[in-house]
């Protein structure tokens, strides 16, 4: 297995070196849709979850009754001041970056979706910004760390 420097997996390092990019809360709130406030609904068809706009007739149980598949940024908040997560969608499917936050506002995890499948690397951090978990979906590899950066578990994704 490949050796990892936990310092190079810290949130600060990845942000400073532009390995990952995180949208500001202001941008997400201004340009995104709130899952709890906007007319967007999750529908499962054929084993896939789609985010859709329901038509004016209410909330039907068939995709044909939806006025369109959602594309854009969707977010959910902790009250009015914090965001729980934001996620990109294209044609109703998870597609692009997803970022989840602790209730303190610090980043909890970061991952990338392609047509509702996780791709690349999923990073999860402790609230102090140290790496907690790294899952590399391209290499089918999973590594977990303690708060001091020591590997505690590794195996397949």
Regions found by a protein language model. Give the residues of each.
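Glycine/tyrosine- and acidic-biased, solvent-exposed loop/turn segments at the edges of beta-strands
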Residues: 1-157
């Amino acid at each position: 297995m490949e050796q990892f420097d936990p310092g190079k997996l810290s949130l600060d390092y990845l942000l400073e070196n532009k390995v990952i990019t995180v949208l500001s809360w202001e941008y997400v709130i201004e340009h995104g849709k709130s899952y709890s406030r906007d007319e967007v609904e999750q529908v499962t068809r054929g084993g896939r979850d789609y985010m859709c706009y329901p038509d004016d007739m209410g909330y039907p149980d068939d995709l044909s009754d939806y006025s369109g598949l959602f594309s854009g940024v969707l977010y959910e908040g902790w009250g009015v001041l914090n965001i729980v997560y934001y996620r990109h969608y294209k044609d109703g499917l998870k597609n692009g970056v997803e970022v989840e936050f602790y209730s303190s506002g610090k980043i909890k995890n970061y991952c990338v979706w392609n047509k509702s499948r996780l791709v690349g690397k999923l990073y999860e951090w402790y609230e102090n910004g140290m790496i907690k978990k790294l899952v590399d979906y391209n290499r089918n590899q999973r590594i977990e760390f303690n708060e001091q950066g020591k590997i505690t578990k590794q195996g397949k994704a």
